[in-house]
Curated annotation (Swiss-Prot):
Lineage of source species: Eukaryota, Fungi, Dikarya, Ascomycota, Saccharomycotina
Ranges in a coiled coil: none
Keyword Cytoplasm: no
Organism this protein belongs to: Zygosaccharomyces rouxii (strain ATCC 2623 / CBS 732 / NBRC 1130 / NCYC 568 / NRRL Y-229)
SUPFAM superfamilies associated with the record: Chalcone isomerase (SSF54626)
PANTHER family, per the entry: FATTY-ACID-BINDING PROTEIN 2
Feature: transit peptide: 1-48
Gene from which the chain derives: AIM18
Gene Ontology molecular function: intramolecular lyase activity
One GO cellular component term noted in the UniProt record for this chain: mitochondrion
UniProt protein name: Altered inheritance of mitochondria protein 18, mitochondrial
Length: 312
């Protein structure tokens, strides 16, 4: 089941039950002809021993209590509905959508991880990737389609289809193709970015721009992308600081547009910031989150790949 690994990582007890997620009716069919394929981690001693043993026992008990206190900080009190990504921020919801949030539909958590600045091992934010409940059917339709499976995925006949898909999703070139084809169907996705330390809107905006420009196809689409990035910069209508544990939401809509929103945890209110209409911006951004040669967050990419395979 898709959420089992997620909830195990969030310390769900063996008694907790995970409710089933119903796949809703299909939105639109997947057409194989639209598939795109790229080109060619004595007693005195006994007394002394007894005292030593008692001391060690006492030390062990104290140490155990300290570890128990540390572990309590990571316990998720609502493990059926949330996932603990980082003990320093609020748990990520497993399901998210309206009316609390101004999204177009309901979403379920597909994978999560964190973003590090590698050269100084500096954690910047935690990242959650969600998929629209109504669009889950597109995952097996695309990744298990006869044409794509035969021509591109199931190349190792000694492995099962799931094993081949897993290998492809963890391959720098194949993952970009598979995720690209999934996004091209209009599959709605949502990214939740939660800073683990105080930052500001400019830093978040600049980070998104750099991520998009790092996409392998960015240079080949520079002119179109430039206008889209201008839209993205203008979408950040809110200025100033973004406190730790607030959220930036990026919703990839069915038509490829990207809706930017901000959740102020202190006020418990979500603000729509702006809309990016150029489809390449959202596609390149989510491609970088979910695959490609240099995924922005390797932990998130592996988590997404694992749960996509579980959906097949």
């Amino acid at each position: 089941m898709l959420l089992n690994p997620l909830l195990k990582r969030s310390r769900v007890s063996s008694k907790s039950a995970i409710r089933n997620i119903s796949l809703l009716s299909t939105r639109r069919a997947y057409h194989p002809q639209n598939v795109q394929i790229p080109r060619p981690f004595t007693k005195g001693r006994q007394t002394y021993y007894g005292l030593s043993l008692a001391g060690l026992t006492a030390a062990w008990a104290i140490n155990s209590q300290l570890h128990a206190a540390d572990n309590d900080a990571n316990v998720n009190d609502d493990a059926e509905n949330t996932v603990m990504v980082d003990k320093n921020i609020s748990p990520f919801p497993v399901h998210i959508g309206p009316p609390k949030y101004p999204f177009s539909t309901d979403y379920s958590l597909l994978g999560y991880g964190y973003r590090y600045v590698t050269f100084i091992s500096f954690k910047v934010y935690d990242l959650g990737i969600y998929i629209a409940d109504q669009d889950k059917h597109l995952v097996p339709e695309v990744l298990s389609s006869k044409f794509l499976s035969t021509a591109f995925v199931d190349t190792d006949h000694s492995k099962s289809h799931k094993e081949n898909v897993n290998a492809a999703l963890n391959d720098s070139e194949k993952s970009a193709v598979l995720i690209g084809n999934l996004l091209d169907t209009g599959c709605r996705m949502l990214a939740k970015i939660t800073p683990v330390r105080n930052t500001d809107f400019n830093h978040l905006k600049d980070g998104l721009v750099k991520t998009i420009l790092a996409h392998p196809e960015a240079k080949n689409n520079q002119e179109i992308l430039n206008s889209g990035l201008k839209e993205l910069k203008e979408a950040f209508t809110k200025k100033g600081k973004v406190p730790k544990d607030h959220d930036l939401f990026l919703e990839l809509q069915a038509n490829g547009a990207l809706q930017v929103a901000y959740y102020d945890r202190k006020k418990d209110k979500t603000f729509r910031l702006g809309l990016v209409n150029e489809p390449l911006v959202g596609k390149f951004l989510f491609s970088q989150y979910m695959g490609g040669p240099k995924p922005l967050s390797p932990t998130t990419q592996k988590s997404v790949a694992e749960h996509i395979v579980a959906m097949l």
